[in-house]
Each structure stands twice: as C-alpha cells, then as structure tokens.
C-alpha cells in the first residue's frame, strides 16, 4: 500500500490441526507442495508482491540458510531472487549482526517499532512464519490481515498457531482458495471494534 499507512500481514502455513511446526520444531510438512505447479505459481506471485518481510529469529535463520544458496536459485529462481532482494526485518534479542542481504535487526521494543512503522507511509509488511512474533503483534492489535495456508496433514504434536493469546481476537474471512494439492488458503482481516 505505497503512499498510505502501512498494513501488517502474517502468512502462516499450518497443518490440519493448526500447527506451524511439528514436535521437533521442523516445518518440512509445509513444503510438500513444492512439486505442485499451481502451488509454486501461488508462492511465486506472493513473493513478487513486494513489501517488507519480517521474521523472528528461528524463521529468519531457516530462511537465511536457504534462499541465498545456489540450490534455492536453481530450484525456485523467481522466488529466490525476490526473497534475497526484498527488505527484511528480523526481531531477535540474541542475533548480533544479520548476514542475509537487506536485513534490519530489531533487538528491543518490537511492539513500539512496528507501531511506528505502521504509522509511516511505505510498503506493507508481511510476517512469514514466526509464531511468537505473530502472537505478540496480534495481542497488541497491530496485525491487520492473516493469511493461513492449511496443508492437508495432521501432525498430532508441535507448536500451534496463535497459542497463548490473552484474549479473543475477532477476524473476518475475506476470501478462500482451494488448490488441487489439497491445500486451502484463507484470508482474514482484523474485525474492527464496533
């Protein structure tokens, strides 16, 4: 949303039982669609949309270990190019100097930093994965939209999406898309108080 106030979105891939990571904190279940052309096109279109990417430390480390590699460039050239070129923010109290190109570190006052960024004009911000960051920013009512990609697998254990919210947060379903590989993407917007 260039020229206006920024919007903050979260994109999360979850299992049928609402988990974004399995019991070993792995997210490989979310990448079973890699060979599916329709899903690959959807992901490439998302990456081409631009904006600013935001991550927590764990997700950042996973992304930074994959996207800058020759293997990523060969497997998914369009997505790799965009992921490496886009501006990125990593929220971490332990990371001292991010190595991935175009990355800014936020080491304290995440809520205040995001609140200030949203009050400025500029490109929209999208959180990828990063469950604890999503929960913190949703609790502070800073997330405007949530995009949930449901993968057709039940994990039985692991980290659940939006776990630990101290109060209910109402969202409105805006649209859905069903993929031939069995995945479903749901787009929600935060419901404004009446």
Give short role names for the model-derived ranges.
Residues 1-194:
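Enzymes that bind and transform nitrogen-containing heteroaromatic metabolites
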């Amino acid at each position: 949303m260039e020229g206006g106030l920024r919007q903050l979105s979260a994109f999360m891939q979850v299992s049928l039982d609402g988990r974004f990571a399995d019991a070993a904190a792995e997210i490989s279940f979310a990448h079973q669609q890699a060979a599916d052309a329709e899903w690959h096109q959807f992901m490439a279109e998302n990456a081409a949309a631009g904006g600013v990417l935001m991550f927590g430390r764990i997700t950042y480390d996973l992304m930074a270990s994959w996207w800058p590699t020759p293997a990523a460039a060969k497997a998914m050239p369009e997505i790799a190019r965009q992921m490496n070129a886009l501006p990125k923010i990593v929220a971490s109290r332990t990371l001292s100097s991010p190595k991935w190109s175009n990355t800014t570190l936020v080491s304290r006052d995440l809520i205040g930093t995001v609140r200030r960024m949203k009050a400025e004009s500029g490109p929209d911000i999208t959180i990828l994965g990063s469950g604890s960051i999503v929960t913190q920013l949703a609790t502070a009512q800073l997330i405007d939209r949530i995009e949930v990609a449901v993968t057709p697998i039940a994990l039985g254990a692991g980290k659940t999406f939006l776990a630990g919210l101290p109060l209910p947060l109402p969202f409105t379903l805006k649209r859905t898309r069903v993929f031939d590989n069995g995945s479903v993407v749901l787009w929600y917007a935060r419901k404004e108080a009446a």
